[in-house]
Curated annotation (Swiss-Prot):
Lineage of origin: Bacteria, Bacillati, Cyanobacteriota, Cyanophyceae, Acaryochloridales
Chief location bin: cytoplasm
Gene Ontology molecular functions: acetate kinase activity; ATP binding; magnesium ion binding
GO cellular component terms listed in the entry, alphabetical order: cytoplasm
One GO BP: acetyl-CoA biosynthetic process
PANTHER family cross-referenced by the UniProt entry: ACETATE KINASE (PTHR21060), ACETATE KINASE-RELATED (PTHR21060:SF15)
Enzyme Commission (EC) number: 2.7.2.1
Protein name as catalogued: Acetate kinase
Binding site for Mg(2+): 7, 385
Gene3D superfamilies: 3.30.420.40
Origin species: Acaryochloris marina (strain MBIC 11017)
Amino acid sequence: MKILVLNAGSSSHKCCLYAIEGPLPDHPAPPLWEAQLDWHDPNHASLKVKTKRENLEEDLSDVSRADALSHLLTTLWHGPTQVIQMAQEINVVGHRVVHGGQDYQSSVVVTSEVKTAIADLIPLAPNHNPANLEGIKLIEQLLGNVRQVAVFDTAFHSHLPEVAAIYPGPYDWQQQGIRRYGFHGISHQYCTQRTAEILGRGVDRLIICHLGNGASLTAVKQGQSIDTSMGFTPLEGLMMGTRSGSIDPGILIHLMRQGYDADQLDHMLNKASGLKGISGVSHDLREIEQAIAQDNAQAKLARDLYLHRLKACLGSMLMSLGGVDVLVFTGGIGEHSASVRAETCEALAFLGLKLDPILNRKSPVDQDIAAVDSKVRVLVIKTQEDWAIAQSCYEQCC
């Protein structure tokens, strides 16, 4: 079976192709082909394609989104990165869909009803669901009636306990769909499964730290999400690359009274806050650490604030679980920043958590970096959302 995975965003398309023969393997299979399309402005994009044998890089000018994606897909069966003979070899296409609302608690085959539901949820995910829906429609145009599967980022959190899901506003907010949904669910679910594989056992109490440009924590009890830091939107929770995370809602009322409108507040909180907003340097923690080395006080404040908020939110997840048996770090920062892991774990030393400093500095993938005598295991996991989407497609089709 050949499975194409499409992760369509507002400014990029990421795709990969998997070939699965026989039963699903126990470990993630490497893709046959990977491609990324990044938009620099509405008519200009850059394309990168990677296969085992060849790499391809191109600049695309004066092209529509549909034409650019069509060109990207043709590199599957044409040119130096060809890995299949024709488009008809693709059996199924899986899509990451950020918001599935209350109705979609697992992956589903895309139908007209599903497309309508994704469109109806655009007000809850205006930066993501439109691009996800566009990706589905483009595949329909380019690949005809190939089966498509929607894999929802909210699904893993769809069974949150009421006390974790309901906001303490008016009770009728629930009828409006205003509740905690949680995000990064594909990553959190993958890490939950991968943790059990690495340790060779199920885990009772697990906290997953997905730390990238977007960041979230999830408390997992016996394989089920019971609390998570992102909420009604991916804006809630931790301080992130450009997002503020949780702030006093009274600040927004204050700014509205000063004349700010919804679009200005949206941009401020989603694009001009977080590490970028505080440091004035970058959303990238690596660049912030370079600025700190040059005695940039604002950059140091941004990093200190990032870690303070991370530790505070970890405390919340810890209380929801009543302790922790395994702590997982994933995402770009989680996987690669030994210093963030070390400083975070130092705050949990009272639990008997001890890192192996040598292993931590090596940032090993899919390994336990806790000391032998640590009472809490600490794993670094390379999240593989694309593979998780491919797994969902396989399960829908077999």
